[in-house]
Regions:
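A structural signal for multi-pass alpha-helical bundles of membrane permease subunits
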Residues: 5-304
C-alpha cells in the first residue's frame, strides 16, 4: 500500500513539471493556430483593426480569392521546385558521407573534426548566409563573376541575381549547403543504432561495402529516412528566411515562396489578415496531404 502511494506521489510531480510547457504551448502555439484558423473565415483587415465579422453568406470567400491569385500558385510552384532542387542532392551527399563515416572496414581518422566542419553551415544565421551569397554573386563586381571571367568561362559578368533560374538555383544551393550536415548527423545516428551483428553476418557472407550499404544500411534506415523526408518537406514548404533575405522573392517572383506570400498578404499593402490566414490554412492542408502521402508510400508491406 505504501509503495502504491509512493509511486502515485512521484507520478504527480511529472504532471506538475509539464504544466509550464502546457501553459506556454497553449499561449504561443495553440491559441495563435486556432485564432488564425478563425480569421480565415472572417473579413478581418487592417493593422490594429480588432473589429471583424464572420463571412456568413460566403464562408470560403477568402480561400477562393487566394486560389484565384496567380502569385499564390506561383509561390507554391517555386516552393516545391526549390525544395526538390535542394533535397535530392542534400540527401544524396548526406548518405554518401554517412557511408564514409560509418564504414566497418575503413576507419577514418579525425572523424569528429570532419563532422563539425560539415555541420558548421547549419549553425550560421540565415542573415549572414544571405549577405554572404549576395556578395559572392554580385554584379558586375563579385568573386564568382571575377573567377568565371578570369578563367575564360564567360566573356563578361553575368547578372545571376537578375536571372530567374539562376536565382532559384542559388537559393536551392544555399538550402542544400546549410542542411546537408544536419541530415548527415541524423543518418549517422540511425546507422549507429543498427545491430552490429547484422553487418558481421553480411561480411561473413562475402558482402562488400557497397552491398552492405544498400542491402543492410538503407533498409534499416527506413524509419530515419521517413523522418528526414517529412521534416525536410515541412521545412521546405515553409521556407522563408533565405529567399526573403537573399533577394526578397525577386526577380519577377522567381523566389517567392508560400510563406513569403502569406507575409505579404498580412503585412504589406492592405494588411489582409483574413487572406493571409486562409493561405496559411491552405499551406497546412498541403503539408498534411504531402506528409500523409509520404507515410503511405514508405510504410512496410505488412502494414498495407
Amino acid at each position: 500500500m505504501m509503495k502504491q502511494r509512493s509511486a502515485f506521489s512521484y507520478a504527480k510531480y511529472g504532471y506538475l513539471f509539464s504544466i509550464p510547457f502546457i501553459i506556454v504551448f497553449c499561449i504561443f502555439n495553440l491559441y495563435p493556430t486556432v485564432y488564425t484558423a478563425i480569421l480565415g473565415f472572417t473579413d478581418c483587415k487592417g493593422l490594429g483593426n480588432t473589429d471583424w465579422n464572420f463571412l456568413v453568406d460566403e464562408p470560403f470567400k477568402n480561400f477562393v480569392q487566394i486560389l484565384k491569385n496567380p502569385s499564390f500558385i506561383t509561390s507554391i510552384k517555386n516552393t516545391f521546385k526549390i525544395w526538390i532542387m535542394n533535397f535530392i542532392p542534400q540527401l544524396s551527399l548526406a548518405l554518401l558521407l554517412t557511408a564514409w563515416f560509418t564504414s566497418h572496414r575503413n576507419t577514418l581518422k579525425g572523424q569528429g573534426f570532419f563532422k563539425v566542419v560539415f555541420y558548421m553551415p547549419n549553425i550560421i544565421t540565415a542573415a549572414s548566409i544571405a549577405i554572404l551569397f549576395n556578395a559572392l554573386f554580385g554584379y558586375p563586381m563579385g568573386p564568382i563573376n571575377d573567377l568565371l571571367v578570369s578563367s575564360g568561362m564567360i566573356d563578361s559578368p553575368f547578372a545571376f541575381i537578375d536571372n530567374k533560374f539562376a536565382t532559384q538555383c542559388i537559393v536551392a544551393f544555399i538550402q542544400f549547403w546549410q542542411w546537408y550536415g544536419y541530415t548527415m548527423i541524423i543518418l549517422i545516428s540511425g546507422v549507429l543504432g543498427i545491430n552490429p551483428e547484422i553487418y558481421e553476418a553480411a561480411e561473413l557472407d562475402g558482402a562488400n561495402d557497397v552491398q552492405m550499404f544498400f542491402q543492410v544500411t538503407i533498409p534499416n534506415l527506413k524509419t530515419i529516412l521517413l523522418y528526414t523526408l517529412i521534416t525536410s518537406l515541412i521545412g521546405g514548404l515553409t521556407m522563408y528566411d533565405i529567399p526573403r533575405l537573399f533577394n526578397d522573392g525577386k526577380p519577377d517572383n522567381a523566389t517567392l515562396t508560400a510563406t513569403m506570400f502569406i507575409h505579404n498578404q498580412a503585412f504589406k499593402g492592405s494588411y489582409m489578415y483574413n487572406r493571409a490566414a486562409a493561405a496559411s490554412l491552405l499551406i497546412f492542408i498541403i503539408v498534411a496531404i504531402c506528409s500523409a502521402f509520404v507515410f503511405l508510400l514508405m510504410r512496410d508491406k505488412k502494414e498495407r
